[in-house]
C-alpha cells in the first residue's frame, strides 16, 4: 500500500509541472533524481542501515518521482508518432515496458535476493539506477518539447505530407 501511495501522489502533485516547466526537463529531472535516490538507498541497504520500514519509505520517495516521470514519458512517447501509427507505437512501448519492468526485472531481482548477499542486491539497485539516469539523459539529449502543442504540431500526420515530394509515403 505505501508504494501505491508514492505512485499515486507523484503524478498528482508533480503532473502540472510537466506542462508548465516543460516535459523534457521534468522527465529528465524525475528520472535522474529517481536513479540517484536509488543509488543512495542501495548504499544504505548494503551497509545494513535500513529496516523494512525505512527501505519502504525510501522506495515511496523514489516511486513518487519515478512514477511522475514515467507517466509523462509514456504520454510523450505516444505524442511523437504520427496519428496513423500512434496506437501501434503505444502498444509496442507498453508491451516492452511490461516485459522488462513486469517480468524480467522481478525475476532478476528474485535471483539476486536468493543469494542472501546484500552486495548482489545492491548491484541490482545500481543497474536500475543506471537505466533511470540513462533514460533521463536520453530525454535531455533527444526529447521533444511537446507541452502546450497540439498532437499535429508535435508529429505531422502522414496523410498531411505531400505526395510525390519524397517527404512522405507515396
Can you say where each PLM-predicted feature lies in the sequence?
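Transmembrane-helix signature of 12-pass secondary carriers
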Residues: 1-170
